């Protein structure tokens, strides 16, 4: 159910959690109908596959961009161009048509064991750096999700804000996110928390920092040969 983004959204809605409305399509006629409906309801819409990882297949749809934009941005596509491309799929891929939320996005990195959160840190990405928070409004939602799905290990839950600033659940990734190592700069070591729990070890924890900014640095090294 976590991997099926449509079923996941329905479960979140059933739990009265802030999910995002979505129409599932598996045929070009269904796609056209869903696009028409969602364009009438929302100022911006997007499409993403029911099954997928690392954002593969996600696009924001717009009537006002040229077909060539797809060669300049892999996340923005002309609506009619997307419909034409989808019509050529054999067999069709199940897709979701959704509102495109234009607010801030955050990633919550979590160490958990049998549905219980051991530690978590939220990351917000900016152009040149990331901010890590040990307290965040999405954490209470994460507790409900981790318990309901009995999550175990290092996972990541993604959220995005609407134009009113309210957070909505995007998805659960049942694996560590690429940037989860940034979180250690808060003083919270997610890997150590998980190992200590599983092996019944006593963990010495430093006093965590509430908010930190983390800047990635790429350094060249001279080969002595």
Where are these regions (language model features)?
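Short loop/edge segments at beta-strand edges and connector loops
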Residues: 26, 99, 155
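ATP-dependent carboxylate activation and anion-phosphoryl transfer catalytic cores
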Residues: 128-225
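A generic fold-level signal
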Residues: 3, 53, 92, 103, ...
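Short hydrophobic/aromatic beta-strand or adjacent loop that forms the aromatic wall/cage
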Residues: 56-58, 105-107, 156
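Active-site nucleotide/adenylate-binding loops and adjacent lid/helix of ATP-dependent enzymes
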Residues: 2-94, 114
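Phosphate-binding site of ATP-dependent enzymes
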Residues: 70-145, 149, 160-168
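Short, solvent-exposed loop/turn segments at secondary-structure junctions
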Residues: 52, 102, 125, 174-175
